[in-house]
């Protein structure tokens, strides 16, 4: 019998073992679809971004008008830009749901996969931030100024780091040029990290909703999960194209229709909606360094998840108290997102401070205590 090139060819063999003959648990739900959706988001963003970069000029005098030119004069330029801008929002929706699923079902116990995932999140956040600056609108400029200025809170070397990042004494042409270079480069770093993420995942195999070892009951990835993923892709592309075609500016900031002006500060500086929860945590501490540390901790706390797992059960499927706590955390994050979009005045300040405190308390204190309590209740 002739050897099957799919199983013997060095390159095809790798693809086969990752996407075709990969043994997958038979009971993974739609919550496991988000990995492939994120791959689709990344591919879409790289493709649309490449097409946009062909028409973009990274210069403070031309950036804003080059984006307008893309939308007005380039064939389907408006569609490419709208898909890219709203694709970022859907990218983050998928990322947050993917992390939430990992947290709910205890997937963080695959430590290497989880840690590379958190690194991916940090890289994605950096990419989105530098990308937001490129259209050179008012909110782009002032967002860049405010967020990069945070690094000046680092004792002794802070101001030097900020001026080095800016390429001068304020956000100006050198800043825009380097941000464009970084925005072009980082998605390929994300693609590389994704391969590492997948390598670690396929080393241990996927988790499943029951949180038990599923070696005795595996099915091939293709055709079962490949078809399931295609359904997921369709369900993702439908709202994305709907948003891009019917209401492309829904999630954007109206300030960005005004070209950047260093002499006029917008009444309320805020980042894109997917960073608002972290922005609310940053603003809830009335000290610059404290705020920056809290901002960093709001994402870096995910690295501690494997260490804070005290339950004898892996998933939350059979842990009602932890479930209640998990959904409280979700509600808390939604409150933080809302607070981040509001001006810094009463009662939003105190709500933000309470929500920020609750966020860290749930993750660092209440989850381990609840897990230990559930172990005791179940006589583990």
From Swiss-Prot:
Cofactor(s) annotated in UniProt: heme b
SUPFAM superfamilies: a domain/subunit of cytochrome bc1 complex (Ubiquinol-cytochrome c reductase) (SSF81648), Transmembrane di-heme cytochromes (SSF81342)
GO terms (BP aspect): mitochondrial electron transport, ubiquinol to cytochrome c
Binding residues for heme b b562: 84, 183
Subunit comment: The cytochrome bc1 complex contains 11 subunits: 3 respiratory subunits (MT-CYB, CYC1 and UQCRFS1), 2 core proteins (UQCRC1 and UQCRC2) and 6 low-molecular weight proteins (UQCRH/QCR6, UQCRB/QCR7, UQCRQ/QCR8, UQCR10/QCR9, UQCR11/QCR10 and a cleavage product of UQCRFS1). This cytochrome bc1 complex then forms a dimer.
Similarity remark: Belongs to the cytochrome b family.
Protein name: Cytochrome b
Species this protein is from: Oceanodroma melania
Upper classification of the organism: Eukaryota, Metazoa, Chordata, Craniata, Vertebrata
């Amino acid at each position: 019998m002739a050897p099957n090139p799919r199983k013997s060819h060095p390159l095809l063999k790798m693809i086969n073992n990752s996407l075709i003959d990969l043994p997958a648990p038979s009971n993974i739900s739609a919550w496991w679809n988000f990995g492939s959706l994120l791959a689709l988001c990344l591919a879409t963003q790289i493709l649309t971004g490449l097409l946009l970069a062909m028409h973009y000029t990274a210069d403070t005098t031309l950036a804003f008008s080059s984006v307008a030119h893309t939308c007005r004069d380039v064939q389907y330029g408006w569609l490419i830009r709208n898909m890219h801008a709203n694709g970022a929002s859907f990218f983050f929706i998928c990322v947050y749901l993917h992390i939430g699923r990992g947290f709910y079902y205890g997937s963080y116990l695959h430590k290497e996969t989880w840690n590379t995932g958190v690194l991916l999140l940090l890289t994605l956040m950096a990419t989105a931030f530098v990308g937001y600056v490129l259209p050179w609108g008012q909110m782009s400029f002032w967002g860049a100024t405010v967020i990069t200025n945070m690094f000046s809170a680092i004792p002794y070397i802070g101001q030097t780091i900020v001026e080095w990042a800016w390429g001068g004494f304020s956000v100006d042409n050198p800043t825009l040029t380097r941000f464009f270079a970084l925005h072009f480069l980082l998605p390929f770093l994300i693609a590389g990290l994704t391969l590492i993420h997948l390598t670690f995942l396929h080393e241990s195999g996927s988790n499943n909703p029951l949180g038990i070892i599923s070696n005795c009951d595996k099915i091939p990835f293709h055709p079962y999960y490949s078809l399931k993923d295609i359904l997921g892709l369709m369900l993702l592309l439908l709202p994305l194209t709907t948003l891009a075609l019917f209401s492309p500016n829904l999630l954007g900031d109206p300030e960005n229709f005004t070209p950047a002006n260093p002499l006029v500060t917008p009444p309320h500086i805020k980042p894109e909606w997917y960073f608002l929860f972290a922005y609310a945590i940053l603003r809830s501490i009335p000290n610059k360094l404290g705020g920056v540390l809290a901002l960093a901790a709001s994402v870096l706390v995910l690295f501690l998840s494997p260490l804070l797992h005290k339950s004898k059960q892996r998933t939350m499927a059979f842990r009602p108290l932890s479930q209640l706590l998990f959904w409280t955390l979700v509600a808390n994050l939604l409150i933080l997102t809302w607070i981040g979009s509001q001006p810094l005045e009463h009662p939003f300040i105190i709500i933000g401070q309470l929500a920020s405190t609750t966020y860290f308390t749930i993750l660092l204190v209440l989850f381990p205590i609840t897990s230990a309590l559930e172990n005791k209740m179940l006589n583990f």
